[in-house]
Amino acid sequence: MTSGYWVLLALPATALAGVACERIASDYARRIDAGAAVDGATLCAALRAASTTVFLVCAAASLACVVVLILMRALGPLALARAGACMVLLLLALIDARCRVLPDALTQPLMWAGLLLSAAGLGPAPAAALAGAAAGYLFLRGVNAVFVFWRGHEGMGRGDMKLLAALGAWLGWAPLPEVLLAASLGGALVAVLRWGRQAWRATLPFGPFLAAAGGFGLVRGAVVQFPF
């Protein structure tokens, strides 16, 4: 099998993983809407509830595709880890889009996984990963503080800060400005298309755009190339 044929397995694996994430996110959102706590117990309950026959078939088929890719040596340890991170990012994006929350039960393990992989020699250097996690959280914390001073209320949740910290752990500190730029432009474009001139007054979850920009950075490297 030639090297290009790995795409024929990667695409169905991605689609099947997406179906599984959508089922988990749907059940999680229903529980949050019903008044459940935003914690790991609710997430575990959603995972158990989503473990239907369809979910298990999708998960098994996706895993089979991944195993074949590993045997073909088309998917190394870092690529496999990043694929898992992209699944978590997709799940976070779906949850935030539905109930406007980014659960710590997903963002914190994602951050620690990035830091541990960096310490194991996969991904950015440990110093860059630590700097990325710290810079991601502190930068958005500072932006939010300025927004509170200016408008009198918070402009984003702590989950966005923790998500950017997790992306910094996986990507290092250098790509974070590009990730933020891509996410901000995407959010602004969607707001303008949806609300027109009233876009500046609209509230839109930032997590899906951060997750999309970060996932693209994990898969392809730089999201936006600065000319300097």
Task: Outline where the language-model segments fall.
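A membrane-topology feature that recognizes alpha-helical transmembrane segments
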Residues: M1-F228
